[in-house]
Amino acid sequence: MRQSDGATTALVVGLGNPGDEYAATRHNVGFEVLDALARRLGERPFLLRGRSLVARAAVDGPAGQRACLLAKPQTFMNNSGRAVRDLLTEAEGPLELLVVCDDFHLPLGRLRCRRSGSAGGQNGLASILEHVASLDDRQVPRLRVGIGDPGRVPAEQYVLRPFKRAERPAVDAVVDRAAGHLHDWLGHGDLDRLIEACNAPDPQA
C-alpha cells in the first residue's frame, strides 16, 4: 500500500537515558516501549540521526499506508527537548508528535494517555514542552507508563534504579500492551481511540 495523500508522518518519541548503565532502569521504560514497537513493525533498526536514534517504518491502515519515525533522544532525559526540536525543524513535512515516558505517579503496569497537559514532574517531558512550545502552539500528546510509587526513596534516585526481578513480568506486559496500542494508533491515526484504549482498565488486573 502507498501512503495516503495528505497523511501526516507520525513521530513517536520514547524517553530515556543513553548508555548500558541506564538500559534497565525505570526511567528508560519509554525506550523499552519503542524497542517493542520496532519489533512489531519488523525489527526496524535504530540509526543515529542528529541527537536521536531513529527508526523508520510504514504502517498499513484503513486509509492507506502511514509513514512513522520512532525516536530515542540521546541527549539524556533532562535535555530531550533539544533532540525533539531538531527532529521537528529538520523534517521535510509535518509530523504528528507523541511522547512515551515513565510516570512514578502511576502504579506499576498502568497506562495513561492524554492530548496535552503539564509535565507532571517528568523532566524529559518538561524539556520537550519547553522547546516545542517555542515552535508553535503544538499540543504534545503523551503516553505515560506507570513505574510505581517511589515511597520514601527520593524520586531522582528511584527513577534511575532497575526494576526488581519480581516486577519484570508486569513491566514486560505493560511495555507490550503500550506497543500494541501504539501500533494500532499508527494504522488508524485516531488519537481518541488510543486514549480510550490506554486509559481503559488493564484486563489482566
Question: Where are each of the predicted segments found?
Answer:
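Nucleotide and nucleotide-moiety/phosphate-recognizing core
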Residues: M1-A119, A126-P141, D149-P154, P169-D202
